[in-house]
Design a protein with these regions (language model features):
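N-terminal Sec-pathway targeting helices
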Residues: 1-15
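Sec-dependent signal peptide cleavage junction
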Residues: 20-38
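Terminal, regulation- and interaction-focused segments at domain boundaries
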Residues: 22-25, 55-108
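Compositionally biased P/S/T/G-rich terminal and signal peptide-adjacent segments
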Residues: 32-79, 149-153
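Core dinuclear metal-dependent hydrolase active-site scaffold
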Residues: 147-221, 291-374, 445-486
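Active-site metal-binding motif and surrounding structural segment of the metallo-beta-lactamase
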Residues: 202-259, 367-386, 397-401
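Metal-dependent catalytic neighborhoods of phosphoester/phosphodiester hydrolases
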Residues: 236-247, 264-274, 391-394, 414-417
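Binuclear metal-dependent phosphoesterase catalytic core
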Residues: 401-404, 409-483
Length: 486
């Protein structure tokens, strides 16, 4: 009996050992066949994109929003869209960023660009990060820019008005130019300046002379912001020319250059490779040639949608930048649509400058803004009166229209009547209360501006032999738009 019990015990032990061996083998096989499960942190953008710049940025929590691929729009300017996001999700995301150690540099306030866009900009380590929410579109734009800096003029500073005389006025000067181009100088109440473009290289010495004529003798003009609408030579040429001459550089102080350098993708999509990127590359680097009042190198700042700049007594809103135009959705492949849209608020009045913007810019603007946004006191006509179209004219209301050239046609192709937009310009002139060009001299508007009170200064003496002098020839051909009122 004892022997039988021993045999049963041995059999039981053997079964236990075999069972254990079986489970050991199965566990080993299972471990070898089952891949290791990677834990994905969906609170970070690393869960949604492989782009290196976004790996350490918290993801935006959204119920219905869709994340786009990351696109490079410029000089380290990496854009991600969140289509279908809400204002509440935007505000929650702003709080999330601050909790994650992102330092808020600025925002555009509860006014939210007149109710169209909330925008806030942050810094962390060497990263600048701007979040803009287009309220009408339920669309959030995220722009991550490693190595970029944010302008101090994105924040209001009351001290900039200290010592300003109570009777000081803000004036806008549309400068007389050699040929084609944009050149606007805004003289602020503190005696400093904001410049838009500046014209071609040949206009550079006249621009410097004019700035010096506007300040007390012996003082250097202080340019708080120099905006370049886009990288075409009739807009950035004067700035580049000045930067190459140390004597000219030393005639002015420049606090910052505001320019959006396009990426190779933008050049390829907008121009099918037909645009020379050299001008854009040079303009993107030019700020370092200048010094501010403290002797530091001026910086380049990239204007982004929804940002608001405070220069002394005026505000400038970035109504549109190239980041709002998806590359695959351009209505036309026209590099002019990289022009930035800037809405100026001066003494309660509205002044729009948008460079050479073309169909894409106009149509996107009409989608993003009600027509009331374009109830304009002063309007700088697009592309020197070439890109004038009835559909946009009828969408807006104008009091004063400034022609940035006295011509109705392109100077380089006067034989193409389609560029003249004769009927379209006539419709624009009939739609405004007054129009004026710089054909007889620089035009000056004093704010608050009343229709009919502009002044035309004495025509320039073209004393510098640095460019083709076409003034008399153009006047003789009758291409001058002139002035008028309705």
């Amino acid at each position: 009996m004892k022997k039988k019990v021993t045999i049963v015990a041995l059999i039981a032990l053997l079964l236990v050992l075999l069972t254990g061996l079986f489970f050991f083998i199965m566990l080993k096989v299972t471990a070898e066949e089952t891949p290791e499960v990677e834990v994905v942190d969906i609170t970070m953008f690393s869960a949604y994109t492989d782009h290196e710049v976004y790996q350490d940025i918290p993801a935006m929590k959204t119920e219905n929003g869709k994340f786009s691929a990351v696109e490079d729009y410029g000089k380290k300017d990496y854009l991600m869209n969140v289509n279908g996001s809400t204002v509440e999700e935007y505000k929650e995301y702003i709080a999330t960023l601050e909790k994650a150690g992102f330092k808020k540099h600025s925002d555009n306030g509860e006014d939210a660009m007149e109710g169209y866009a909330y925008t806030a900009s942050f810094t962390k380590d060497n990263l600048a990060f701007t979040v803009s929410h287009a309220i009408r579109e339920d669309h959030t734009y995220l722009v991550a820019s490693p190595g970029d800096e944010l302008s101090p003029y994105l924040n209001y500073d009351a001290s900039r008005m200290e010592g300003v005389p109570a009777d000081a006025k803000t004036t806008v000067h549309m400068l007389e130019l050699h040929t084609n181009g944009n050149s606007f100088v805004i003289k602020l109440k503190n005696g400093h300046f904001v410049i838009h473009d500046g014209g071609i290289a040949a206009d550079a010495p006249y621009l410097l002379d004019y700035l010096e004529s506007q300040v007390p003798e012996g003082e250097k003009p202080v340019i708080e912001g120099w905006f370049i609408s886009h990288a075409h030579g009739d807009h950035s040429g004067a700035l580049l020319a000045i930067s190459k001459n140390i004597q000219d550089v030393n005639r002015i102080y420049v606090e910052g250059v505001y320019f959006s350098q396009p990426s190779p993708m933008v050049y390829e999509k907008l121009t099918m490779g037909g645009e020379d990127p050299t001008n854009g590359l040079m303009t993107g680097m030019v700020s370092g040639a200048f010094k501010d009042q403290n002797g530091n190198a001026a910086k380049n700042y990239r204007p982004l949608y929804g940002q608001r700049y405070y220069f002394c007594d005026i505000m400038i809103d970035v109504s549109l930048s190239m980041e709002q135009f998806p590359p695959e959705a351009y209505y036309t492949t026209d590099f002019n649509d990289t022009s930035v849209w800037l809405m100026h608020h001066i003494e309660g009045q509205r002044f729009l400058i948008a460079g050479d913007t073309h169909h894409t810019g106009m149509r996107v603007a009409m989608n993003m803004f009600d027509s009331s946004y374009f109830d304009l006191d002063v309007f700088a006509v697009f592309h020197h009166a070439i890109n004038v179209w009835d559909y946009f004219t009828d969408y807006c209301k104008y009091k004063t229209v400034l022609y940035t050239s006295w011509r109705e046609a392109s100077i380089w192709e006067p034989s193409r009547p389609s560029l003249a937009r004769v009927a379209e310009n006539e419709h624009l002139r009939q739609s405004c209360e007054e129009y004026v060009s710089h054909g007889n001299g620089t035009v000056v508007l004093t704010f608050p501006y009343k229709v009919g009170t502009y002044k035309v200064l004495k025509p320039l003496d073209w004393k510098y032999d640095n460019g083709v002098k076409l003034i008399d020839k153009q006047h003789a051909e009758g291409q001058w738009v002139g002035t008028g009122s309705n």
